């Protein structure tokens, strides 16, 4: 407001301002109807107060095309789509949902990718009308991922095998089915998809039962006929192996082929029937990677189980052993025996191992026949296995010479296994010399233990021992101790009268020295003075504690001045 020094002048201007404002109000309606023409000049203070800066005007009138992303500036589709639907399809949230719904689907061919880029239709339209789309494998709804839904082709292929069809003429299915573990019976070795046990499974079970009858009918039968079927299928490509073998006991047939022929009818159907290719395994019969009992062997009565995995040149008489082995493995199998039962020794081997802490060798093998008869319910199979082993198979354990020993004839000059005899009682010449020298095993046979002891004195008479230790005190006891130490690994009685310190047997059943003569390094030695022989009580007889050897060594060390 403009002020003036005089009040009269001030009132005059107020009247003029009011009259001008009232006249402008009256003319406002007329101005609005006409083209906009400012009646007030630009220098008017009202117009100057309502002006906007030029920067703001430029910002408001500038083009906003560069702000938008080029993906949102695509041309409109040919099909009429509402703008709301278009915005919903192209929003980032909708694109994210569409991407997540396509996870796990098979990749579409490039033509359908192009069509999905150009067309903005719904995904259902696209999946039904898109060209060259991959056929959906049993998945009807494309917008949702169902990983656990079963494909429709599986149902067709599993139900397509009727009871009259053979597996070799099965129609190949369109897709390769995934291998599933078999849940059916282990005898029906058919395709990888689990099937109901129809006529084909019954035929397989009949075949296997016939095999069991033929193999386990008689342990000493001259001929054993066996069948085995192995079937592996993938997408209708069936591979079948049918084996039909006849073995005569007179011929030298290898144990590997025979154990394959009859044991696989029960074990390989469950191992190979699942459709998986089984690798070479030491526990599989017929693949002699390592001489272990095969998987078809079961614990009771299988005396020949330890030899069924050996190659042919290890076994001199193949036929009778194989018949007895098959009879014992198939006839004496328990219902609850696992397929890995052959990985450990049979029950006869484990039951007759001596658990005495003084026992230093496998000296309980004379009880093998009794353990076989006790653990096997089929006495004929056990007797057949024992009679097959009568012909002589080497065992990898050293045996005690004073027990009943049955050894093979001395024909194992370059045998790769441990060349000591396997022991079975009731033989006319049960005592065999097991002495091993640089020329090989002695293997001489005697009818009584006295003759064997007299013969063993020829082995234990070391010529150089007296000369070596003659300069030391107590030379007689030292010589006998040295001779005993030389023969210790075979548990042979060396030279010396019964009851002398040099007489060293395996162990006494009830020896009097016991643990008291054990060598304790941090205690005072209770042994007698050096030079005196170690006393043996009369109750022990010809036996002597093996731990008294520690006393002899201690006596030797103290005599030489080492203590």
UniProtKB/Swiss-Prot annotation:
Residues 199-211 have a biased composition (Basic and acidic residues). GO terms for molecular function: zinc ion binding. This is Zinc finger protein 503. Belongs to the Elbow/Noc family. It comes from Danio rerio. It holds the Pfam family nlz1. Residues 1-10, 174-194, 212-226 have a biased composition (Polar residues). It comes from the Eukaryota. The gene is znf503. One of its GO terms (cellular component) is nucleus.
């Amino acid at each position: 407001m403009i002020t003036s020094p005089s009040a009269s002048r001030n009132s005059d201007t107020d009247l003029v301002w009011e009259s001008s404002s009232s006249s402008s109000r009256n003319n406002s309606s007329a101005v609005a109807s006409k083209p906009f023409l400012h009646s007030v000049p630009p220098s008017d203070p009202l117009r100057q107060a309502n002006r906007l800066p030029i920067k703001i005007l430029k910002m408001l009138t500038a083009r906003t095309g560069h702000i938008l992303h080029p993906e949102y500036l695509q041309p409109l589709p040919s099909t009429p789509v509402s703008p709301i639907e278009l915005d919903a399809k192209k929003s980032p949230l909708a694109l994210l949902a569409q991407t997540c719904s396509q996870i796990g689907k098979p990749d579409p061919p490039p033509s359908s990718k192009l069509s999905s880029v150009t067309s903005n239709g719904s995904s259902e339209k696209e999946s039904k009308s898109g060209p060259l789309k991959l056929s959906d494998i049993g998945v009807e709804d494309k917008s949702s991922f169902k990983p656990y839904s079963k494909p429709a082709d599986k149902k067709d292929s599993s139900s397509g095998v009727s009871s009259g069809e053979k597996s070799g003429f099965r129609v190949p299915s369109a897709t390769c089915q995934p291998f599933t573990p078999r849940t059916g019976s282990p005898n029906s070795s058919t395709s990888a998809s689990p099937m109901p046990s129809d006529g084909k499974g019954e035929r397989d079970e009949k075949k296997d039962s016939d095999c069991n009858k033929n193999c386990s009918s008689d342990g000493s039968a001259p001929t054993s006929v066996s069948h085995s079927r192995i079937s592996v299928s993938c997408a209708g490509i069936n591979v079948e192996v049918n084996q039909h073998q006849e073995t005569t006991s007179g011929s030298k047939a290898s144990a590997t082929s025979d154990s394959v022929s009859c044991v696989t009818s029960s074990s390989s159907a469950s191992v190979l029937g699942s459709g998986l290719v089984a690798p070479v395994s030491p526990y599989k019969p017929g693949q002699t990677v390592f001489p272990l009992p095969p998987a078809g062997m079961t614990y009771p009565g299988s005396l020949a189980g330890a030899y069924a995995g050996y190659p042919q040149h290890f076994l001199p008489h193949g036929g009778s052993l194989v018949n007895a082995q098959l009879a014992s493995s198939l006839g004496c199998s328990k219902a609850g025996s696992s397929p890995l039962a052959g990985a450990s020794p049979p029950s006869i081997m484990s039951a007759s191992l001596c658990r005495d802490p003084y026992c230093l060798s496998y000296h309980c093998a004379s009880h093998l026949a009794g353990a076989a008869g006790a653990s096997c319910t089929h006495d004929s199979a056990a007797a057949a296995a024992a009679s097959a082993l009568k012909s002589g198979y080497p065992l990898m354990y050293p045996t005690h010479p004073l027990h009943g020993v049955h050894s093979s004839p001395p024909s194992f000059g370059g045998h790769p296994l441990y060349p000591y005899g396997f022991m079975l009682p009731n033989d006319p010449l049960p005592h065999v010399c097991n002495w091993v020298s640089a020329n090989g095993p002695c293997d001489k046979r005697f009818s009584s233990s006295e003759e064997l002891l007299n013969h063993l004195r020829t082995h234990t008479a070391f010529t150089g021992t007296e000369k070596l230790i003659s300069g030391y005190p107590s030379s007689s006891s030292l010589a006998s101790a040295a001779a005993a130490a030389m023969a210790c690994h075979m548990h042979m009685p060396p030279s010396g009268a019964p009851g002398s310190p040099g007489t060293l047997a395996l162990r006494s059943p009830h020896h009097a020295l016991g643990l008291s003569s054990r060598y304790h390094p941090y205690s005072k030695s209770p042994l007698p003075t050096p030079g005196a022989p170690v006393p043996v009580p009369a109750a022990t007889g010809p036996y002597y504690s093996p731990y008294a050897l520690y006393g002899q060594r201690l006596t030797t060390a103290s005599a030489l001045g080492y203590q």
